[in-house]
C-alpha cells in the first residue's frame, strides 16, 4: 500500500491538471503561432506562472487498489501483484493464465 499522503498528493495533481489543462493548451498554441519574439516571451512568462503540478507529465500511473506506482499495467489499471492475485481469483473477466 502506498502512503496516504502520496495518494492525496497525486489526487491534488490530477485536479490541478484538469483545472488548468485548457488554459495551458491555449497558451501553448498561441506560443506556437506567435509571430514576434516579444509576444512569445510574454506568453512563455504566462505559461511559467501556472502551477508546476498542473503539467500532465507530473502525473504518475498508480494501481487503483493498492496505489503502487511501479509494475503498473495500463490495460487493467492494476499493479503486477494485484493483477496476479485478481487473475487467480477470476475477478478480471477474460483474463486466463497462460499454459502451453
UniProtKB/Swiss-Prot annotation:
The answer to whether keyword Repeat applies is: no
Tell me where in or outside the cell this protein is found: Plastid, Chloroplast
Q: Which GO terms describe its biological process?
A: translation
Q: Does the keyword Ribonucleoprotein apply?
A: yes
Q: Which residues cross the membrane?
A: none
The record's listing under InterPro entries reads:
Ribosomal_uS14, Ribosomal_uS14_bac/plastid, Ribosomal_uS14_CS
Task: Give the top-rank taxon of the lineage listed in the UniProt record for this protein.
Answer: Eukaryota
Cellular compartments per GO CC:
chloroplast; small ribosomal subunit
Q: Name one Pfam family in it.
A: Ribosomal_S14
GO molecular-function term, one example from the UniProt record: rRNA binding
SUPFAM superfamilies, per this entry?
Glucocorticoid receptor-like (DNA-binding domain)
Q: Which UniProt keywords apply?
A: Chloroplast, Plastid, Ribonucleoprotein, Ribosomal protein, RNA-binding, rRNA-binding
Q: How does it assemble?
A: Part of the 30S ribosomal subunit.
What role does this protein play? Binds 16S rRNA, required for the assembly of 30S particles.
NCBIfam families membership: PRK08881.1 (NF006477)
Task: Please report which protein family the annotation says this sequence is part of.
Answer: Belongs to the universal ribosomal protein uS14 family.
List the protein's name.
Small ribosomal subunit protein uS14c
Amino acid at each position: 500500500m502506498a502512503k496516504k499522503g502520496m495518494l492525496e498528493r497525486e489526487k491534488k495533481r490530477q485536479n490541478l491538471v484538469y483545472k488548468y489543462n485548457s488554459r495551458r493548451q491555449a497558451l501553448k498554441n498561441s506560443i506556437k503561432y506567435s509571430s514576434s519574439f516579444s509576444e512569445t516571451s510574454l506568453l512563455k512568462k504566462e505559461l511559467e506562472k501556472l502551477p508546476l503540478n498542473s503539467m500532465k507529465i507530473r502525473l504518475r500511473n498508480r494501481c487503483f487498489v493498492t496505489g503502487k506506482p511501479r509494475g503498473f499495467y495500463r490495460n487493467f489499471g492494476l499493479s503486477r501483484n494485484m493483477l496476479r492475485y485478481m487473475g487467480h481469483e477470476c475477478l478480471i473477466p477474460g483474463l486466463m493464465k497462460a499454459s502451453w
